Amino acid sequence: MAKINLVRIDSRLIHGQVITKWLKMSGANRIIIVDDELAKDDFMSIIYTTAAPKDVSVEILSVEDAKKGWMENELGNGNLLILFKDIKTCYELKNEGVNIENIQIGGLP
């Protein structure tokens, strides 16, 4: 069972502040981005995956895949930083039963 260390809503997803401050502060060793559009975009997925430090794994999941991962084994192992591009997606996943207790709001359009 993974431990959700930080849930952040930020339209920029992985960027300097997330990597230099929030990743270290949260102690996460895995980043999960939940976004239906990004999960279908191989090129942008590579961009976001390579933006993280080499010792941090990045997974990009659709809402449905994140829900399945939570129901099957609570998203596996490790300490998680879960990123959402918008409030709607975070709300949708919480309503599907994912244990989101606290949410940090970052840059939104």
Feature locations, PLM:
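N-terminal intrinsically disordered, cationic/polar leader segments
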Residues: 3-6, 11-25, 30, 38-40, ...
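Short, well-ordered alpha-helical microsegments
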Residues: 16, 67, 90-91
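Short glycine-/acidic-enriched loop or helix-start segments at secondary-structure transitions
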Residues: 43, 70, 91-94
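N-terminal active-site wall of soluble small-molecule enzyme domains
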Residues: 63-72
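A polyampholytic, Gly/Pro-enriched intrinsically disordered region
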Residues: 78-86
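Long, charge-patterned amphipathic alpha-helical coiled-coil/hairpin "stalk" segments used as oligomerization
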Residues: 85-109
